[in-house]
């Protein structure tokens, strides 16, 4: 019976090990080695009692909760150099005994808050060589108290869970090198008393905030837990913000300065402390005074220079710091925007620029001009308040709403789309901030506002509707008469005018086409006359030279300079070949056809010009085409 029992035990042991893997039973622990096996997923028949599971150098793409279910005794899990792109929620939920987790060399781009939940006793977490761009703030929460080594190097991280990392009291090694980190929160390493190695090489750090952790690396013998700090390969900005680091005197490091230009490329520890300087802020330009209508957007600008770049703040008229809200936005570049201005937004704003070298301030005044509303009156009570266009120019012409001593508003130089509004100040009155023009047309009842500076006494209205009636009123905006008013408005006068109708293009087209037709006709006659005159001169000159009728060119033979040419042979007379109707041979013979050809040429030229310009005339104005045709016939 012994041999069959032995075979059964061997068979059961072989079935517990996945086919492509190698299983080693070393005393009480079981190791499953599945590296370099070409696996596409975690083998489902791995012994649940496995203590060490190596799945490195395969092609596994995703991890899920069933892959490691009930492996409560697993201590070491290696998944390095696979193609893992996704880790499901609580994939390691049953690995309560796990001490070491290697996920380096994969294709992870993100770790969620529940991706690493489960291994509460994890001590070594290796995530280097991935494509991580984000790690959720709570990703490390399950093993904050137990983690000793954390490696997230060679990724694309701009931020890491600083709050979680700063709460790891047992952390010994932290590798953050070769990422895109550009800032460290102040005091983030203050609680890491056991940290012995911090690697920040090749990031984008321009400055480092003072931290007690860095002083432990200055004297390794005196420090109870010396720190090995590396931060070379960063674009350090060597100014007063890094003076504390320069005083640590670390002669073995090879950091260099990237800026300012005067220190660029110099060895960090060789720069004298006196050259680590800053420049106080200087307000380069800012908005001094801004006037806006009630309800409009207000943009206050403030620009400051300094080293380092100043931080910008705004203080409102109520001496409170202006922050981002549903109505206002304060941008880092010093711009303050108020979306919809109201009466309470008016006042003096203060722009504050600060940096470690000092601060600078600038005052910006915002004036909010209240829109005219029906029923408003100024503090004096005797003058009309903000105008409503409903009290039209017709009412104003009857003497309602204007004072006789005030000059009337005039609209002159009216065209189809524009009109010039003119006015005067008349007798001395309250100081005027600016003028406001209100108008609307019979085509559109929408009220249009125009703001004009106080120094102007005329304004050109553009983009008016042709052939429309307009009502226009002019108001003067003056300083507030009382503490509760923002502006006081005074009606200067109203006017009524009408724009001209749209001008037809027919007359312009007639003049253009008629002028072109006449030019072509006269040109044709001149060319024909010149051609006839030239032919006549040639005929007369040849006849006077020979004293006889000129021979036709077809009866003349050419001769060379080499010898005598043979006498022309006599031929019986023959009738000349027929000539084309539209050609004239200058053979010094019968020239009667040339005169006719010249006249036909002039007529054809005139008819061609008529076909071009006459078509336009026919399409635009038929009467002009007929007159042009009669003109061509009379001229030709």
Swiss-Prot record:
Domain LRRNT, residue spans: 17-48
Location of the protein in the cell: Membrane
GO CC annotations on file: cell surface; GABA-ergic synapse; glutamatergic synapse; postsynaptic density membrane
Modified residues (Phosphoserine): 585, 627
Primary subcellular site in the record, as a coarse category: membrane
Region annotated Disordered, chain positions: 556-585
InterPro entries on file: Cys-rich_flank_reg_C (IPR000483), FN3_dom (IPR003961), FN3_sf (IPR036116), Ig-like_dom (IPR007110), Ig-like_dom_sf (IPR036179), Ig-like_fold (IPR013783), Ig_I-set (IPR013098), Ig_sub (IPR003599)
LRR repeat start and end residues: 49-70, 73-94, 97-118, 121-142, 146-169, 170-191, 194-215
Record topology, Cytoplasmic segments: 540-636
Motif PDZ-binding boundaries: 633-636
Entries under PROSITE patterns matching the protein: FN3, IG_LIKE
Residues covered by the Fibronectin type-III domain: 405-502
Biological process, per Gene Ontology: regulation of postsynaptic density assembly; regulation of presynapse assembly; synaptic membrane adhesion
Residues on Extracellular side: 17-518
Coiled coil regions in record: none
Tissue and organ distribution: Expressed in brain and testis. In the brain, weak, but broad expression in the cerebral cortex and diencephalic nuclei. Also detected in other parts of the central nervous system, including the olfactory bulb, pons, cerebellum, and medulla oblongata, as well as in the peripheral nervous system, such as the ganglia of cranial nerves and the dorsal root ganglion during gestation.
Ranges that cross the membrane: 519-539
Modification after translation, per record: Glycosylated.
Similarity section: Belongs to the LRFN family.
Assembly with partners or alone: Can form heteromeric complexes with LRFN1, LRFN2, LRFN3 and LRFN5. Unable to form homophilic interactions across cell junctions. Interacts with DLG1, DLG2 and DLG3. Also interacts with DLG4.
Role of this protein: Promotes neurite outgrowth in hippocampal neurons. May play a role in redistributing DLG4 to the cell periphery.
Protein's name in the database: Leucine-rich repeat and fibronectin type-III domain-containing protein 4
Source species: Mus musculus
């Amino acid at each position: 019976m012994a041999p069959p029992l032995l075979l059964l035990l061997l068979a059961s042991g072989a079935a517990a090990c996945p086919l492509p893997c190698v299983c080693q039973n070393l005393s009480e622990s079981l190791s499953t080695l599945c590296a370099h096996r070409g696996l596409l997923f975690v083998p489902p028949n791995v012994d649940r009692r496995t203590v060490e599971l190596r799945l490195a150098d395969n092609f596994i793409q995703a991890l899920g909760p069933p892959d490691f279910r009930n492996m409560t005794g697993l201590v070491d899990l290696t998944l390095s150099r696979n193609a893992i792109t996704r880790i499901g929620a609580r994939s390691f939920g049953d690995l309560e005994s796990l001490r070491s987790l290697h996920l380096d060399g994969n294709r992870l781009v993100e770790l969620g808050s529940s991706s690493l939940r489960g291994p509460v006793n994890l001590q070594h977490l290796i995530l280097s060589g991935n494509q991580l761009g984000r790690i959720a703030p709570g990703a490390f929460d399950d093993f904050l108290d137990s983690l000793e080594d954390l490696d997230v190097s060679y990724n694309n991280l701009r931020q890491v869970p600083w709050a979680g990392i700063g709460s790891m009291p047992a952390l010994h090694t932290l590798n953050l090198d070769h990422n895109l980190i550009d800032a460290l929160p102040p005091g983030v390493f203050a609680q890491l008393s056991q940290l012995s190695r911090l690697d920040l090489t090749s990031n984008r750090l321009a400055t480092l905030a003072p931290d007690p952790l860095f002083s432990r690396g200055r004297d390794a013998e005196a420090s109870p837990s010396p720190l090995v700090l590396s931060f070379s390969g960063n674009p350090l900005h060597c100014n007063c913000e890094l003076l504390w680091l320069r005083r640590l005197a670390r002669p073995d490091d090879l950091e260099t300065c990237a800026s300012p230009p005067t220190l660029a490329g110099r060895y960090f520890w060789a720069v004298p402390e006196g050259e680590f300087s800053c420049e106080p802020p200087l307000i380069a330009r800012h908005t001094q005074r801004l006037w806006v209508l009630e309800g409009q957007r207000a943009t206050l600008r403030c620009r400051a220079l300094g080293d380092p770049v100043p931080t910008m703040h705004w203080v409102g008229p109520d001496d409170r710091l202006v922050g981002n809200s549903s109505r206002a936005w304060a941008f880092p570049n010093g711009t303050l925007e108020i979306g919809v201005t109201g009466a309470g937004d008016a006042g003096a704003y203060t722009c504050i620029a600060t940096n470690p070298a000092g601060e600078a301030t600038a005052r910006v005044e915002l004036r909010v001009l209240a829109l005219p509303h029906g029923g408003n009156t100024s503090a004096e009570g005797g003058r009309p308040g903000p105008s409503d266009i409903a009290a039209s120019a017709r009412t104003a012409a009857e003497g309602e709403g204007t004072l006789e001593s005030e000059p009337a508003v005039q609209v002159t130089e009216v065209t189809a789309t524009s009109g010039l509004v003119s006015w005067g100040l008349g007798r001395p009155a309250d100081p005027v901030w600016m003028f406001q023009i209100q108008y609307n047309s019979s085509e559109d009842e929408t009220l249009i506002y125009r703001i004009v500076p106080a120094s102007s006494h005329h304004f050109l209205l553009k983009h008016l509707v042709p052939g429309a009636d307009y009502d226009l009123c002019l108001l003067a905006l003056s300083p507030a008469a009382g503490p509760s008013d923002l502006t006081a408005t005074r009606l200067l006068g109203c006017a009524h005018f009408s724009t001209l109708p749209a001008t037809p293009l027919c007359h312009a087209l007639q003049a253009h086409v008629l002028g072109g037709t006449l030019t072509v006709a006269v040109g044709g006659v001149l060319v024909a006359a010149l051609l006839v005159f030239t032919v006549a001169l040639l005929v007369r000159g040849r006849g006077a030279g020979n004293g006889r009728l000129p021979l036709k060119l077809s009866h003349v033979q050419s001769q060379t300079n080499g010898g005598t040419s043979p006498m022309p042979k006599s031929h019986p007379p023959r009738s000349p070949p027929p000539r084309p109707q539209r050609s004239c041979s200058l053979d010094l013979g019968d020239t009667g056809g040339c005169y006719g050809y010249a006249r036909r040429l002039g007529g054809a030229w005139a008819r061609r010009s008529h076909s071009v310009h006459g078509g336009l005339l026919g399409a635009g104005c038929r009467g002009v085409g007929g007159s042009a045709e009669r003109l061509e016939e009379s001229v030709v």
